[in-house]
Amino acid sequence: MKTMKTIITAILAVLTFTCCMAREKKPAIKARLKGYPSGAIDEYHFHAGKAIVKGRFVNRTEHSFSTFNVTGTDLFSNQAFVRTINIEPDGSFLELISLPHSGWVYFDGAEIPPAFIAVGDTLDLLINGTGDETTISGSGATGEVNSVWPRLETQFASKETRTPWKEMNREFMLEWKNRKVRELDRIASAIDADTITLLNGCSDYAKDVLKTSLLAMPLEQALVALHQWWWRTRSEDRKPNPALTISSDSFFDFLSARQSYLMDNPLMILAADGDGVVNNMEFYVLNAYLYLANDMERWSKSTDSEELGSYKENFILPYNYDPELHREMLEYDKGRLIPVADYYSMCSDSIRSRFKLDHTGFMMQLCLLHRVLDFDFEGSDGWFLTRKAEELAGAIPQFTDPSICHHAVDAYRRFVIEREGSARIDASNPTPGDSLFQSLKEKYAGNVIYMDFWGIGCGPCRKGMLDQRTLVEQYKEAPVRFLYICNEKDSPREPSEKFLTDNNIQGEHIFISSDEWNLLTNKFQFNAIPFTLLIDRNGNIVEKNVPPTAARLDELLK
């Protein structure tokens, strides 16, 4: 415990120094187009805070649900968040919710379109329970953005927002990209000339959010098209077809000249399509942070120690000095160590040389932060905590944006608190979600449990269940239980059970109500399916969102 606190203290001290240097080196947000950004949104606007969600359902049916979820993504840590809203018998609701930062949210369990919500504001919803009509208003920038955006989106939206699948080929994809760049330039010109009349009367804060949402719209459509193309041109083992491959360098050749308002723009966090832009940009443009090590063909051997294997594949130096390990690492890298800080620097150089991008750009820093904050690991051992501390320390030289520094430290602090047990649930005062989860586990106590939250309309969910049939059959006599849980509102019994029967999908099939589903999504903070949990025989969660394997199940059965 003392070691971890020392590591955190050191990271805080160095990051504080780094942030100070960042403020000296460049302004928080400088103007790129005329009057954009306005300067109304500063670093503090990207901090976490509270907001009020209130409103009313009218014309509700007698058996309507009593809760719905506000969902979204913390685009700094790349973690989903879920907040449950309780509905009173008269249809009204009023909740004070916490947000990781201002941005766009979605609604699960109710037919409500996405909405912008700023920390410190109130989001007001009037929902017609018999249809899909919703009136969205609110205080401050929240009210302004939600009032203007539907009309602004309609004015500037392209007639072609989705890539026609039947027409997709290499030439079409490059032409599609060029169309989206022309749309992007048209929007940038309108912003630069200040000719968007719908923005008249809006506050500078609201104008910045709305302008950024316009810029993000064609960019996100180009990125989604590439995402579709990437999956379409790969075989089942995800290997590309050389005859169909499009070079990322040629597809994204437009970014360099526009990087000031696309790549080095923190306001993209607040855009209506911000999550799509950030996630696809990370995977298709800035993926050197994810895959450069594979391109370098660095693989460990089964005979390597854990420390040596971690260095070979993740560039992590062992925490305590060992002369023998030092010799082995130098031998592997031909006399020059490559610690994780040098590896991240190599990644930045690779991206910069390919796309001619500024290595200090906000989007590049954000992608690296996502790489470092990949905390999808349920173990609480000191090795993993130390490894993450090393990765964060190695990334520090690349972080110059104060908002990135703030969220990096905050996310790691929360990660350590959770893993060290300081924020454990008080067993004497469990939440409804805790109680429901406990009741699901109790029936299968003493078994290894694979819990899969799925939906009939989810293709990856159905494929995962089909792929697991052999594994379910293999362990049918062992103390292993496969639980497939779905929301009966979204996955009605008749079509769901037909799919299960027709495809001989064994296991325990559990249908829960929409309210129960909301309790569990809130407890585990997931807003997409499939979402899976692997639970050991003592009832402890050991993995999230990791496909089950025979080797892992055998390990848990020992």
Regions found by a protein language model. Give the residues of each.
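Short pre-active-site segment immediately N-terminal to redox-active cysteine/selenocysteine motifs
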Residues: 447-449, 453-457, 489, 528
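Non-catalytic, surface beta->alpha helical segment in thiol-disulfide oxidoreductase systems
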Residues: 527-531, 537-558
